[in-house]
Regions:
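Extended, low-complexity cationic-aromatic segments
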Residues: 1-70
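C-terminal anion-handling pockets and recognition modules
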Residues: 1-3, 115, 126-181
């Protein structure tokens, strides 16, 4: 069984802006060609290996969620997948219900190929994947002078996340630790 801590991130052109040093009482101008440019990413952190699986999508919705899960299935063929995720409507919507019914058809619950479990409502601090997104956006802010186009911002973000060696004490919340009795 593979446990994946999943979340979506919406990267916008404004995410590259942060704090910079400048002369006092002098505004710093950062040109933005289109503040509405946006890229949605699906990401899941493997609980055991801490490997991060990044996937570009046009939006966060049921169709793209199912596509992401199918893509994750290709990464772990013949392994049951458990997704821990937030309460986004498309995680439990019509497309997901149909996908789960087809994928797990006629199989007992313990043997399902794909299972989705929700974190507590309104508790993003429970999901270590939120910390991955924060690290990626923090990296972007440090690279603001280098990334002149939104395509460069997207490339910088995904390259950083693909190379990231992520560790977090939050992962131990979901993984049993050995204790002497």
């Amino acid at each position: 069984m593979i446990v994946l801590l999943e979340d979506e991130c919406h990267l916008v052109w404004g995410d590259v802006c942060g704090m910079v040093w400048g002369k006092r009482n002098t505004p710093i101008v950062v040109p933005m060609t289109n503040e509405r440019e946006r890229q949605t990413y699906y990401g899941a952190l493997n609980l055991l290996t801490q490997e991060f699986h990044l996937y570009e999508a046009s939006a966060g919705n049921g169709v793209n969620t199912v596509a992401y899960i199918r893509w994750c299935q290709t990464l772990y063929p013949d392994k049951p997948l458990v997704f821990l995720w937030d309460g986004a409507s498309y995680h439990r919507g019509e497309e997901m219900q149909k996908f789960l019914a087809e994928t797990n058809d006629g199989v007992a619950g313990a043997d399902w190929k794909v299972t989705g479990m929700r974190f507590a409502p309104n508790a993003p601090e429970q999901n270590p994947t939120e910390d991955v997104w924060l690290k990626g956006k923090t990296h972007l802010r440090k690279q603001f002078a280098v990334n002149k186009t939104f395509a460069q911002v997207k490339r910088c973000f995904s390259t950083f996340l693909h190379a990231l060696q992520f560790t977090s004490t939050k992962l131990s919340w979901y993984w049993p630790t050995e204790q002497m009795i």
